[in-house]
Amino acid sequence: MIVIGRSIVHPYITNEYEPFAAEKQQILSIMAGNQEVYSFRTADELSFDLNLRVNIIISALELFQSGFQFRTFQQSFCNPQYWKRTSLGGFELLPNIPPSIAIQDIFKNGKLYGTECATAMIIIFYKALLSLYEEETFNRLFANLLLYTWDYDQDLRLITKNGGDLVPGDLVYFKNPQVNPATIEWQGENTIYLGNFFFYGHGVGVKTKEEIIYSLNERRVPYAFISAFLTDTITRIDSRIMSQYASSSTPQTSISFIPIRDDAIVATVGHTTTIY
């Protein structure tokens, strides 16, 4: 369910002609129908979260189509015009290079880059935020950028939780417990849920849950008997915090609300919100 302040609401898009209106309405309907509580202080925060999710999906598909290569950290490579490859296989932003330009280059010249799936997910998150921020703001927040697995910038605020309901734009993890040690990079797959039962994972592409599990199962030890599976771990950008940096020139999604209850008591412990 969706909560704005203390009101449980059912939101709907009022302008059906705005970009990705159908996709945004689908996301709103999923969130409103889920048992998980999605709590926002204002309607603008919800609008930011909605546009962020859409841009995460767009960025995932753009990265998929960019020619970006799958490589282990030992084999990783990057465009030396913008990045320096570290000894561990990460990408360190060169001095005096704006992070916005360097992130955009990954999507423009994907064939000049190769790394593993976790780093790819963080790149998608950065690109989605860049779509909603002024470049000056993005460059200030993410100066001295390092792209290396989950070692992301401290100003990128993420929420990771176990349990909850899947929403398009979520980052979820497939685990392969009996992976073949010879191909340890396939011990799991970080993916973006695109909606309509499809996921994007760097290395596996755009596939259904069943297809990703099949792909991981093909990389298990001989005589393996435990299947790969989709875990209940969900990672999201903390839109309540990151929305404060949004560009004032970014068009807001026009949302109206059908009130359901306006006296809810909202309690949050960790990353779990409960309604009384």
Curated annotation (Swiss-Prot):
<dbReference type="GO" id="GO:0030435">
    <property type="term" value="P:sporulation resulting in formation of a cellular spore"/>
</dbReference>
<comment type="similarity">
    <text>Belongs to the bacillus TGase family.</text>
</comment>
<comment type="function">
    <text>Probably plays a role in the assembly of the spore coat proteins by catalyzing epsilon-(gamma-glutamyl)lysine cross-links.</text>
</comment>
<keyword id="KW-0012">Acyltransferase</keyword>
<dbReference type="InterPro" id="IPR020916">
    <property type="entry name" value="Gln_gamma-glutamylTfrase_bac"/>
</dbReference>
<protein>
    <recommendedName>
        <fullName>Protein-glutamine gamma-glutamyltransferase</fullName>
        <ecNumber>2.3.2.13</ecNumber>
    </recommendedName>
</protein>
<dbReference type="GO" id="GO:0003810">
    <property type="term" value="F:protein-glutamine gamma-glutamyltransferase activity"/>
</dbReference>
<keyword id="KW-0808">Transferase</keyword>
<dbReference type="Pfam" id="PF20085">
    <property type="entry name" value="TGL"/>
</dbReference>
<keyword id="KW-0749">Sporulation</keyword>
